[in-house]
Amino acid sequence: MTREKVPAKGKARTSGGPGEPVYCSFCGRSSQEVDSMVAGPNAFICDRCIRTSHDILRKELSAIQHPEPVADQPFPVKLVSPKALMESLDQYVVGQERAKKALSVAVYNHYKRIDSQEWQHDDDEVVIEKSNIMLIGPTGTGKTLLAQTLANLLEVPFSIVDATSLTEAGYVGDDVETILARLLHASDFNLERAERGIIYVDEIDKIARKSANVSITRDVSGEGVQQALLKILEGAVVGVPPKGGRKHPEQQLININTKNILFICGGAFEGLDRLIARRMSKSSMGFGAGVADKKAGYDPGILKFVMQDDLHEYGLIPEFIGRLPVLSSLEPLDEHALRSILVEPKNALIKQYAKLFEMDGVELEFAPESLDRVVAIALERGTGARALRSVLENVMIDIMFELPSMKGIGKCIITADTIDGTGSPTYLTEDGKKKKTA
């Protein structure tokens, strides 16, 4: 009995007799491994290689026959690896390593999924589902900045919507379709660009159900909005008024397919830490109970232990939670993080003010102790990075009002007294001498 020898790829093998297998000249598979085999002069090709060749030719012919301007082509997304995405985020967002890593992986997989749809076959058994993202963290920790920075890095349209403005259809407020209209505006009405954009829904915790008990009064801005968002989050063709606002019977609508739009929802979820601590206390025994007792101090850092059941208890319906499978939390910003935010990112606040002063021909310098005072005041206000801009704007507004009218100024030094409002900045002339001010 002799063994069949598989020929090398690229060489055809004809059957030596009835029932003997033949092999594909391209991939080397035998006729027993594939559904069908097409014979040619001294060559064979299997159905799998035919299908692959068809896909390649279809793409190449389409590109040749339909050359279009870049803006009108099916919108390509610049696919960046998760590691490269995170390295880019590091240049703009301080800290929040866990959230940045989770976002980078989720965004990479989302756009990889979109690309795969172009070459996947209809008979493919594995269908990759959409993975929208939920960001949980105290105010001012960078939720919006993370989403916006990702959109900028990927060069996709981006829009921000406040969930508190949304109501059910038929009630005063914005329909949920409004969020798609804003994305359409952000993409300059390029439908294909819009259908691959990112929408950030802020204050998502504010549409939590007000009570676990079913009420006879309608919750038009709570559970009702969650129900209305389900279809959009999952992926559906939605008719959108081009100018936003309410739909009217005779109004022309633009149909947007949301299956490839990435939704990132964010919220502070005030009080969620207590629910998490209570759950951990109930489930902990022995030594673990001591750990849970410490968590019962309701440190916002406990948010990293959040589970979907906690969000359900908070007031989000299970169907809504299920459409936001990627769950990540952000940590409160401490003194070190706030100090870094002031000076380290590419678009740091200090660098922005320095650029504005440079346009007036003046060098701006912040004394180290002045930065300490800005951070201390921001911590007292408890609104995270947002407080930094508020503190600085309050200090700098008078200086920026007077400076353009002052002559011979080469340098402006901000001191701790300047931040406290008990002293003026130090001005130096262009030759380095101290400038007297009235």
Curated annotation (Swiss-Prot):
GO terms for cellular component: HslUV protease complex. PROSITE patterns: CLPX_ZB (PS51902). GO terms for molecular function: ATP binding; ATP hydrolysis activity; ATP-dependent protein folding chaperone; protein dimerization activity; unfolded protein binding; zinc ion binding. Keywords: ATP-binding, Chaperone, Metal-binding, Nucleotide-binding, Zinc. InterPro entries: AAA+_ATPase, ATP-dep_Clp_protease_ClpX, ATPase_AAA_core, Clp_ATPase_C, Clp_protease_ATP-bd_su_ClpX, ClpX_bact, P-loop_NTPase, Znf_CppX_C4. NCBIfam families: clpX, PRK05342.1. Belongs to the ClpX chaperone family. Component of the ClpX-ClpP complex. Forms a hexameric ring that, in the presence of ATP, binds to fourteen ClpP subunits assembled into a disk-like structure with a central cavity, resembling the structure of eukaryotic proteasomes. This is ATP-dependent Clp protease ATP-binding subunit ClpX.
